[in-house]
Amino acid sequence: MKKSIVFPGQGSQYLGMGKHLYDNFSVSKRIFDEVDDALNIKLTEIIFGEDAEKLNLTENTQPAIMAVSIATMEALKKEKGLNINNFSFCAGHSLGEYSALVAANSIKLADAAKILKKRGQAMQNAVPIGLGAMAAILNIQVEDLEKFITANKFLSIEVSNDNCPGQCVVSGKKDEINKLTILIKNELKKKAIPLPVSAPFHCKMMTPAADELNNFLKQFEINNPEIPIVSNVSVIPENDSNEIKKLLISCVHNRVRWREIVEFFFNNNIIECIECGPGKALTNMFKRFEFEIKCVKIDNIDDLKNYG
Protein backbone atom coordinates (compact mmCIF):
# COMPACT_ATOMS: atom_id res chain seq x y z
CA MET A 1 0.00 0.00 0.00
CA LYS A 2 1.51 3.32 -1.10
CA LYS A 3 1.46 6.04 1.55
CA SER A 4 2.46 9.67 1.93
CA ILE A 5 3.15 11.75 5.02
CA VAL A 6 1.99 15.37 5.12
CA PHE A 7 2.56 18.28 7.48
CA PRO A 8 0.24 21.23 8.26
CA GLY A 9 0.90 24.93 7.81
CA GLN A 10 -0.03 28.21 9.42
CA GLY A 11 -3.50 28.38 10.94
CA SER A 12 -3.20 24.95 12.55
CA GLN A 13 -1.61 26.28 15.73
CA TYR A 14 -3.34 26.34 19.10
CA LEU A 15 -2.20 26.92 22.67
CA GLY A 16 -0.99 23.74 24.32
CA MET A 17 -0.39 21.87 21.08
CA GLY A 18 2.12 19.08 21.56
CA LYS A 19 2.07 19.28 25.38
CA HIS A 20 1.01 15.63 25.60
CA LEU A 21 4.07 14.72 23.54
CA TYR A 22 6.40 16.81 25.67
CA ASP A 23 5.08 15.23 28.86
CA ASN A 24 4.95 11.61 27.71
CA PHE A 25 7.71 10.98 25.19
CA SER A 26 11.38 11.77 25.76
CA VAL A 27 12.04 11.67 21.99
CA SER A 28 9.46 14.43 21.53
CA LYS A 29 10.75 16.49 24.45
CA ARG A 30 14.20 16.44 22.84
CA ILE A 31 12.72 18.03 19.70
CA PHE A 32 11.19 20.90 21.67
CA ASP A 33 14.39 21.38 23.66
CA GLU A 34 16.52 21.47 20.51
CA VAL A 35 14.27 24.08 18.90
CA ASP A 36 14.41 26.20 22.07
CA ASP A 37 18.21 26.00 22.02
CA ALA A 38 18.43 26.81 18.30
CA LEU A 39 16.29 29.93 18.65
CA ASN A 40 17.77 30.93 22.01
CA ILE A 41 14.25 31.51 23.32
CA LYS A 42 11.76 29.42 25.28
CA LEU A 43 9.42 28.73 22.38
CA THR A 44 7.92 25.90 24.45
CA GLU A 45 6.73 28.44 27.03
CA ILE A 46 4.93 30.31 24.26
CA ILE A 47 3.40 27.13 22.81
CA PHE A 48 2.28 25.80 26.20
CA GLY A 49 1.40 29.21 27.64
CA GLU A 50 -1.79 31.27 27.65
CA ASP A 51 -0.91 34.14 25.30
CA ALA A 52 -2.50 33.27 21.95
CA GLU A 53 -1.46 36.59 20.46
CA LYS A 54 2.19 35.79 21.09
CA LEU A 55 1.87 32.30 19.59
CA ASN A 56 0.12 33.79 16.56
CA LEU A 57 3.04 36.09 15.78
CA THR A 58 4.24 34.63 12.49
CA GLU A 59 7.86 34.43 13.64
CA ASN A 60 6.73 32.19 16.52
CA THR A 61 3.96 30.32 14.73
CA GLN A 62 6.12 28.94 11.95
CA PRO A 63 8.86 27.26 14.03
CA ALA A 64 6.25 26.21 16.62
CA ILE A 65 4.15 24.25 14.11
CA MET A 66 7.29 22.65 12.70
CA ALA A 67 8.47 21.65 16.20
CA VAL A 68 5.13 20.04 17.08
CA SER A 69 4.98 18.25 13.72
CA ILE A 70 8.43 16.72 14.09
CA ALA A 71 7.81 15.88 17.76
CA THR A 72 4.68 14.03 16.62
CA MET A 73 6.63 12.14 13.98
CA GLU A 74 9.31 11.13 16.49
CA ALA A 75 6.65 9.78 18.86
CA LEU A 76 5.21 7.76 15.96
CA LYS A 77 8.64 6.33 15.24
CA LYS A 78 9.13 5.37 18.87
CA GLU A 79 5.67 4.01 19.63
CA LYS A 80 4.52 2.64 16.27
CA GLY A 81 7.76 1.90 14.45
CA LEU A 82 7.07 4.50 11.76
CA ASN A 83 9.83 4.52 9.13
CA ILE A 84 10.01 7.55 6.84
CA ASN A 85 11.49 5.40 4.07
CA ASN A 86 8.26 3.40 3.87
CA PHE A 87 6.48 6.45 2.45
CA SER A 88 6.43 7.15 -1.28
CA PHE A 89 6.22 10.92 -0.90
CA CYS A 90 6.39 13.67 1.68
CA ALA A 91 4.73 17.10 1.47
CA GLY A 92 3.81 20.04 3.64
CA HIS A 93 1.36 22.92 3.31
CA SER A 94 3.43 26.11 2.95
CA LEU A 95 5.70 26.19 6.04
CA GLY A 96 4.87 22.49 6.45
CA GLU A 97 7.30 21.87 3.61
CA TYR A 98 10.10 22.59 6.08
CA SER A 99 8.69 19.92 8.40
CA ALA A 100 8.69 17.56 5.41
CA LEU A 101 12.33 18.38 4.68
CA VAL A 102 13.32 17.76 8.30
CA ALA A 103 11.42 14.46 8.23
CA ALA A 104 13.26 13.45 5.05
CA ASN A 105 16.64 14.40 6.58
CA SER A 106 17.17 17.18 4.06
CA ILE A 107 17.38 20.02 6.61
CA LYS A 108 18.60 19.79 10.20
CA LEU A 109 15.94 20.49 12.82
CA ALA A 110 17.85 23.41 14.37
CA ASP A 111 18.45 24.97 10.96
CA ALA A 112 14.76 24.64 10.01
CA ALA A 113 13.78 26.41 13.24
CA LYS A 114 16.13 29.31 12.50
CA ILE A 115 15.01 29.55 8.87
CA LEU A 116 11.32 29.52 9.80
CA LYS A 117 11.75 32.23 12.41
CA LYS A 118 13.51 34.38 9.81
CA ARG A 119 10.88 33.47 7.19
CA GLY A 120 8.14 34.57 9.56
CA GLN A 121 9.89 37.85 10.34
CA ALA A 122 10.56 38.55 6.66
CA MET A 123 6.97 37.80 5.64
CA GLN A 124 5.60 40.00 8.43
CA ASN A 125 7.92 42.90 7.59
CA ALA A 126 7.50 42.77 3.80
CA VAL A 127 4.24 44.74 3.90
CA PRO A 128 3.32 47.42 6.47
CA ILE A 129 0.65 46.25 8.92
CA GLY A 130 -2.79 47.25 7.70
CA LEU A 131 -1.85 47.45 4.01
CA GLY A 132 -2.36 43.80 3.07
CA ALA A 133 -5.06 41.23 3.74
CA MET A 134 -6.24 37.71 2.93
CA ALA A 135 -9.67 36.12 2.56
CA ALA A 136 -10.98 32.59 2.13
CA ILE A 137 -13.38 32.15 -0.78
CA LEU A 138 -15.63 29.10 -0.57
CA ASN A 139 -17.68 27.08 -3.05
CA ILE A 140 -15.95 28.42 -6.15
CA GLN A 141 -13.38 26.81 -8.44
CA VAL A 142 -10.03 28.50 -8.81
CA GLU A 143 -10.43 29.19 -12.54
CA ASP A 144 -13.74 30.97 -12.00
CA LEU A 145 -12.29 33.01 -9.15
CA GLU A 146 -9.33 34.10 -11.26
CA LYS A 147 -11.65 35.21 -14.06
CA PHE A 148 -13.75 37.21 -11.59
CA ILE A 149 -10.67 38.93 -10.16
CA THR A 150 -9.42 39.83 -13.64
CA ALA A 151 -12.83 41.01 -14.87
CA ASN A 152 -13.11 43.39 -11.92
CA LYS A 153 -9.55 44.69 -12.39
CA PHE A 154 -8.25 43.91 -8.91
CA LEU A 155 -4.61 44.35 -9.86
CA SER A 156 -3.06 43.47 -6.49
CA ILE A 157 -5.12 40.36 -5.77
CA GLU A 158 -3.89 36.84 -6.43
CA VAL A 159 -5.14 33.39 -5.53
CA SER A 160 -2.57 32.54 -2.88
CA ASN A 161 -3.85 29.13 -1.73
CA ASP A 162 -5.65 26.59 -3.90
CA ASN A 163 -6.44 24.20 -1.07
CA CYS A 164 -9.10 21.80 -2.32
CA PRO A 165 -12.19 21.82 -4.53
CA GLY A 166 -14.29 24.82 -3.54
CA GLN A 167 -11.76 26.34 -1.14
CA CYS A 168 -9.36 29.08 -2.21
CA VAL A 169 -7.58 31.91 -0.43
CA VAL A 170 -6.78 35.29 -1.97
CA SER A 171 -4.11 37.81 -0.97
CA GLY A 172 -3.57 41.44 -1.89
CA LYS A 173 -4.04 45.04 -0.81
CA LYS A 174 -6.54 45.36 2.03
CA ASP A 175 -8.84 47.83 0.27
CA GLU A 176 -9.09 45.60 -2.80
CA ILE A 177 -9.64 42.45 -0.71
CA ASN A 178 -12.48 44.22 1.13
CA LYS A 179 -14.11 45.21 -2.17
CA LEU A 180 -13.66 41.72 -3.61
CA THR A 181 -15.32 40.01 -0.63
CA ILE A 182 -18.36 42.28 -0.96
CA LEU A 183 -18.65 41.56 -4.70
CA ILE A 184 -18.22 37.81 -4.15
CA LYS A 185 -21.10 37.82 -1.66
CA ASN A 186 -23.39 40.14 -3.60
CA GLU A 187 -22.81 39.05 -7.20
CA LEU A 188 -21.70 35.42 -6.97
CA LYS A 189 -23.60 34.58 -3.77
CA LYS A 190 -20.53 32.78 -2.43
CA LYS A 191 -18.92 32.88 1.00
CA ALA A 192 -15.97 35.23 1.44
CA ILE A 193 -14.34 35.22 4.86
CA PRO A 194 -11.62 37.74 5.83
CA LEU A 195 -8.76 35.93 7.56
CA PRO A 196 -7.21 37.15 10.83
CA VAL A 197 -3.70 37.66 9.43
CA SER A 198 -1.49 40.71 9.42
CA ALA A 199 0.16 40.24 6.02
CA PRO A 200 -0.83 39.04 2.52
CA PHE A 201 1.09 35.76 2.20
CA HIS A 202 1.96 33.90 -1.01
CA CYS A 203 1.55 36.75 -3.47
CA LYS A 204 3.86 39.20 -5.28
CA MET A 205 3.64 41.61 -2.33
CA MET A 206 5.88 39.09 -0.54
CA THR A 207 8.75 39.53 -3.03
CA PRO A 208 10.89 41.48 -0.50
CA ALA A 209 10.49 38.58 1.94
CA ALA A 210 11.59 36.10 -0.72
CA ASP A 211 14.69 38.20 -1.41
CA GLU A 212 15.51 38.37 2.30
CA LEU A 213 15.03 34.62 2.73
CA ASN A 214 17.24 33.96 -0.30
CA ASN A 215 20.14 35.76 1.36
CA PHE A 216 19.52 34.09 4.72
CA LEU A 217 19.36 30.56 3.27
CA LYS A 218 22.90 30.80 1.87
CA GLN A 219 24.40 29.97 5.27
CA PHE A 220 22.52 26.67 5.62
CA GLU A 221 23.14 23.26 4.12
CA ILE A 222 20.24 21.51 2.41
CA ASN A 223 20.79 17.88 1.42
CA ASN A 224 18.99 15.66 -1.04
CA PRO A 225 15.94 14.25 0.79
CA GLU A 226 15.70 10.55 1.58
CA ILE A 227 12.22 10.44 0.02
CA PRO A 228 10.83 12.78 -2.67
CA ILE A 229 9.28 16.05 -1.50
CA VAL A 230 6.27 17.16 -3.53
CA SER A 231 6.77 20.91 -3.80
CA ASN A 232 4.05 23.51 -3.19
CA VAL A 233 5.39 25.42 -6.20
CA SER A 234 6.22 22.76 -8.79
CA VAL A 235 3.82 19.98 -7.67
CA ILE A 236 6.36 17.36 -8.69
CA PRO A 237 8.60 15.15 -6.54
CA GLU A 238 11.82 17.02 -5.84
CA ASN A 239 15.04 15.18 -4.99
CA ASP A 240 17.71 17.76 -5.79
CA SER A 241 18.77 20.01 -2.92
CA ASN A 242 19.64 22.98 -5.16
CA GLU A 243 16.22 22.91 -6.78
CA ILE A 244 14.54 22.52 -3.39
CA LYS A 245 16.29 25.63 -2.10
CA LYS A 246 15.07 27.65 -5.11
CA LEU A 247 11.52 26.40 -4.59
CA LEU A 248 11.54 27.27 -0.88
CA ILE A 249 12.31 30.87 -1.85
CA SER A 250 9.69 30.88 -4.61
CA CYS A 251 7.04 29.53 -2.24
CA VAL A 252 7.09 32.76 -0.20
CA HIS A 253 5.59 34.82 -3.03
CA ASN A 254 3.84 32.12 -5.06
CA ARG A 255 0.64 30.13 -4.71
CA VAL A 256 0.32 27.09 -2.45
CA ARG A 257 -0.97 24.45 -4.88
CA TRP A 258 -2.30 21.97 -2.33
CA ARG A 259 -5.27 20.77 -4.41
CA GLU A 260 -2.86 19.75 -7.15
CA ILE A 261 -0.59 17.98 -4.65
CA VAL A 262 -3.50 15.81 -3.47
CA GLU A 263 -4.42 15.12 -7.10
CA PHE A 264 -0.80 14.13 -7.71
CA PHE A 265 -1.05 11.66 -4.82
CA PHE A 266 -4.19 10.12 -6.31
CA ASN A 267 -2.67 9.89 -9.79
CA ASN A 268 0.34 8.12 -8.29
CA ASN A 269 -1.74 5.51 -6.46
CA ILE A 270 -1.39 6.84 -2.93
CA ILE A 271 -3.96 5.06 -0.75
CA GLU A 272 -3.28 6.65 2.64
CA CYS A 273 -1.76 9.83 4.05
CA ILE A 274 -0.76 10.62 7.61
CA GLU A 275 -1.22 14.23 8.72
CA CYS A 276 1.51 14.67 11.29
CA GLY A 277 1.13 17.76 13.45
CA PRO A 278 -1.36 20.11 15.09
CA GLY A 279 -4.99 20.30 14.02
CA LYS A 280 -6.78 18.49 11.21
CA ALA A 281 -6.86 21.09 8.42
CA LEU A 282 -5.28 18.83 5.81
CA THR A 283 -7.41 15.83 6.81
CA ASN A 284 -10.52 17.96 6.30
CA MET A 285 -9.27 19.13 2.90
CA PHE A 286 -8.80 15.52 1.75
CA LYS A 287 -12.51 14.90 2.42
CA ARG A 288 -13.52 17.51 -0.17
CA PHE A 289 -12.17 15.57 -3.14
CA GLU A 290 -14.38 13.33 -5.28
CA PHE A 291 -11.82 10.52 -5.12
CA GLU A 292 -10.88 8.92 -1.82
CA ILE A 293 -7.50 8.94 -0.16
CA LYS A 294 -7.65 7.99 3.50
CA CYS A 295 -6.03 10.70 5.62
CA VAL A 296 -5.26 9.91 9.25
CA LYS A 297 -4.54 12.82 11.58
CA ILE A 298 -2.06 12.40 14.42
CA ASP A 299 -2.59 15.38 16.71
CA ASN A 300 -3.00 13.98 20.22
CA ILE A 301 -2.10 11.00 22.35
CA ASP A 302 -5.33 9.16 21.52
CA ASP A 303 -4.61 9.54 17.78
CA LEU A 304 -1.16 8.14 18.43
CA LYS A 305 -2.42 5.14 20.40
CA ASN A 306 -5.11 4.34 17.83
CA TYR A 307 -2.86 4.54 14.76
CA GLY A 308 -1.84 1.35 12.99
Predicted segment positions?
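FabD-like malonyl-/acyl-CoA
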Residues: 2-144, 272-301
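Alpha/beta catalytic cores of group-transfer enzymes, especially the acyltransferase/condensing modules
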Residues: 10-12, 39, 104-253
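A short, well-structured juxtamembrane/interface segment
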Residues: 256-264
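Glycine-rich phosphate/pyrophosphate-binding beta-alpha loops
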Residues: 61-63, 200, 255
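Short acidic/polar active-site loop segments enriched in Thr and Asp
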Residues: 88, 155, 190, 271-272
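Non-catalytic positions within long, well-ordered alpha-helices that form the structural scaffold/packing
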Residues: 185, 266-269
